[in-house]
Amino acid sequence: MRRRRRRDGFYPAPDFRDREAEDMAGVFDIDLDQPEDAGSEDELEEGGQLNESMDHGGVGPYELGMEHCEKFEISETSVNRGPEKIRPECFELLRVLGKGGYGKVFQVRKVTGANTGKIFAMKVLKKAMIVRNAKDTAHTKAERNILEEVKHPFIVDLIYAFQTGGKLYLILEYLSGGELFMQLEREGIFMEDTACFYLAEISMALGHLHQKGIIYRDLKPENIMLNHQGHVKLTDFGLCKESIHDGTVTHTFCGTIEYMAPEILMRSGHNRAVDWWSLGALMYDMLTGAPPFTGENRKKTIDKILKCKLNLPPYLTQEARDLLKKLLKRNAASRLGAGPGDAGEVQAHPFFRHINWEELLARKVEPPFKPLLQSEEDVSQFDSKFTRQTPVDSPDDSTLSESANQVFLGFTYVAPSVLESVKEKFSFEPKIRSPRRFIGSPRTPVSPVKFSPGDFWGRGASASTANPQTPVEYPMETSGIEQMDVTMSGEASAPLPIRQPNSGPYKKQAFPMISKRPEHLRMNL
């Protein structure tokens, strides 16, 4: 049976675009509060007098107010007594999760300092490879800016970022559930309630990005990861665009063709509505086994996206059919989600009528698939061609010039959650002595090509405000049952039963007919 080809995904590829598979990454850059100077001699003397009063029947320790305690700032520097130096040696390599032209992604265990013993994914990128291509530098910059700004239950977290002379290291949360793509590969297609769950969580992540003025532009199964419970985590922010608010458009041609909105292909100017088209294309992929418009090559695929009818299988419910038609409208202005309500418009559709949005955001809704994991280190949801390799981080034998390294200024990061976990270990009850302050493929996504070399890592509004051209409108027609081609398999596609949580191992490929997915979209096994 022919099967899907793995497309650009999360852990399986550290390089940014033209590669076998692609992983998530994000780079933070925050300025940690600097520790205050050491206490003065007067303060130390005062502390000495306090101890002396205790020794001679003075006030008891629990009679002191907080005014007798010295306050100090919790920061990476202060809690680690002059800071914990995050470096490659802080992590033990466990498995290879992915490999690409720019480096590797490892499963690692932290062996020193805060988070000792915890499992992470470590993405290693070669600086020399990144700086050779302005587009790849732009991808890194976009991910850094966005993941610095957004924190959401359905968006991936980055814990640490650091660098050596020739490499960048990104320490990410380990998402042991693997890619949503792998679930589609196993099941062939999803039942509507399964698709509804994933689409609902994804819509909340997209809505959060849009509130921040960010459009995603590369929604596809490979960029959606699952955590150990089976909840969605949106990854890979290299093609995002910032500062896109109401009335603002951008003209960059980028994305993955099969999921790209018509206005991107026509270069007529686009806004956040492109993400709702992509959600519709993803929904169609989940329910039918392939994106809505595919061709033998990119040109034919683009022609179909711009001109062809939307064929809807007869087994889809009326709610699913209606949502697909409203999301896959070629006229962006009339597309569901394009209005001021954004994600709220999509979430109010009857297809999501059974979703409790508050419980979903709190991750209290049980996912349809819960990964069967044996331990925290389980890598069964990742490609064995990587995980069976011996993990080796090659020597850092290359360095950049001082001017080239300027691109990576502000790279180092420690997540606030790490500082909070350390802060909890400190008691703020009054002490006898006040605490002292410490001293010191055809599926290759199309990348954006706009990049200002002098911009580097700084933030700022860069959105184009040019008036969009008026796009040529082709009517979107939908087919009836008579247009369904069922001759190849002798039967029409239909939803399949799926494994319920905790009811047994995952099924293997279950699609009952020859896959409708084009050869270049299938996994090579």
Curated annotation (Swiss-Prot):
Phosphorylation at Thr-412 is regulated by mTORC1. The phosphorylation at this site is maintained by an agonist-dependent autophosphorylation mechanism. Activated by phosphorylation at Thr-252 by PDPK1. Dephosphorylation by PPP1CC at Thr-412 in mitochondrion. This is Ribosomal protein S6 kinase beta-1. It is an enzyme of class 2 (transferase). Widely expressed. The gene is RPS6KB1. Residues 424-525 are annotated as: Autoinhibitory domain. SMART domains: S_TK_X, S_TKc. Interacts with PPP1R9A/neurabin-1. Interacts with RPTOR. Interacts with IRS1. Interacts with EIF3B and EIF3C. Interacts with TRAF4. Interacts with POLDIP3. Interacts (via N-terminus) with IER5. The modification N6-acetyllysine is found at residue 516. Changing residue 441 to E: Facilitates phosphorylation of T-252 by PDPK1. Residues 381-399 have a biased composition (Polar residues). The keyword Membrane applies. PANTHER family: RIBOSOMAL PROTEIN S6 KINASE. Changing residue 412 to E: Mimics phosphorylation. Facilitates phosphorylation of T-252 by PDPK1. Mimics phosphorylation. No effect on interaction with PDPK1 and phosphorylation of T-252. Impairs association with the eIF3 complex. Residues 91-352 form the Protein kinase domain. InterPro entries: AGC-kinase_C, Kinase-like_dom_sf, Pkinase_C, Prot_kinase_dom, Protein_kinase_ATP_BS, Ribosomal_S6_kinase, Ser/Thr_kinase_AS. GO terms for biological process: apoptotic process; behavioral fear response; cellular response to dexamethasone stimulus; cellular response to growth factor stimulus; cellular response to insulin stimulus; cellular response to nutrient; cellular response to type II interferon; G1/S transition of mitotic cell cycle.
